[in-house]
């Protein structure tokens, strides 16, 4: 079942999102817990941030990684020589594994893009052994100030951008309690939810601007089609918002929040 995530290659993904999932992986696993042995699954592995974090646990026997985007899978394969890791293309809504095959299943920053998150979470439970833990995390819509700064500025100046590469509203599961409800409805027990906070640090305005315009999604086509004067106006407004009244370009940091949920099969 296709996702509604528009991928534009592994390099663009790393610049726009992969670097942040690397920071989120460790606190996510601290909350989720990692089994003392056995097989685990990274469902929706992207370019491998969580997979490689799991590989830091030497007691794990095998680490499966799956993503809908073949180029992300290829990027992960190129990043590791760990013989425990097997990466393949596949659909989180139809996991290509047997029932009760895994000792842990994880999904980091994936389910808000899946067309049927309820089905995906049921699949996560299906492939878990009884008593094992599944966990997932999604960004909080209200807890992403750098992204709100960007998209709110776009919509203030270019309202017709809605639906043309610009989110028309918050994505599903990005409010408190929504992901928890999906886990509970899938039959998980002992469901727990928390908020994880990481810094999103940018070296300068270009480091902030370019990945958001030319990273994942379809906004770049809309932006490039604008008349030059409107492109310049939007970029200038975005730069002013990024600088925040400080005339000097340079590093800026934004604390960003994700909701994480875990449950027992």
Give the location of each predicted region.
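Conserved class I S-adenosyl-L-methionine
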Residues: 1-38, 49-53, 57, 70-79
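A short SAM/SAH-binding and catalytic strip from SAM-dependent methyltransferases
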Residues: 103-117, 140
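A short acidic, Gly/Pro-enriched loop at the edge of an enzyme's catalytic core
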Residues: 93-104
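Conserved catalytic/acceptor-binding region of the Class I
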Residues: 118-119, 129-203
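Conserved Class I S-adenosyl-L-methionine
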Residues: 2-6, 20-21, 47-49, 171-265
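A structural alpha-helix within SAM-dependent methyltransferase catalytic domains
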Residues: 29, 52-55, 118-125, 151
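Class I SAM-dependent methyltransferase SAM/SAH-binding core
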Residues: 39-95, 118-119
């Amino acid at each position: 079942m296709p996702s509604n995530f528009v991928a534009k290659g592994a390099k663009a993904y790393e610049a726009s999102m992969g670097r942040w999932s690397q920071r989120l992986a460790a606190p996510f696993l601290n909350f989720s817990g990692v089994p003392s042995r056995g097989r685990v699954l990274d469902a929706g592995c992207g370019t491998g941030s969580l997979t490689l974090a799991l590989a830091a646990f030497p007691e794990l026997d095998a680490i499966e990684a799956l993503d809908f985007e073949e180029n992300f899978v290829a990027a992960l394969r190129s990043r590791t020589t760990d013989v425990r890791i097997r990466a393949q293309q596949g659909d989180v809504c139809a996991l290509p594994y047997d029932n009760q095959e895994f000792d842990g299943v994880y999904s980091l920053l994936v389910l808000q893009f899946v067309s049927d998150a309820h089905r995906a979470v049921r699949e996560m439970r299906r492939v878990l052994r009884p008593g094992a833990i599944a966990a997932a995390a999604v960004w909080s819509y209200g807890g992403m100030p750098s992204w709100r700064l960007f998209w709110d500025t776009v919509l203030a100046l270019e309202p017709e951008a809605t639906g043309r590469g610009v989110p028309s509203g918050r994505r599903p599961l990005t409010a408190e309690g929504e992901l928890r409800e999906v886990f509970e409805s899938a039959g998980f027990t002992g469901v727990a939810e928390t908020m994880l906070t990481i810094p999103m640090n940018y070296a300068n305005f270009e480091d902030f601007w370019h990945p958001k315009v030319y990273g994942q999604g379809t906004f770049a086509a809309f932006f490039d089609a604008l008349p030059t004067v409107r492109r310049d106006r939007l970029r200038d407004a975005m730069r002013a918002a990024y600088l925040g009244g400080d005339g000097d370009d340079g590093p800026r940091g934004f604390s960003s929040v994700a909701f994480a949920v875990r449950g027992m099969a």
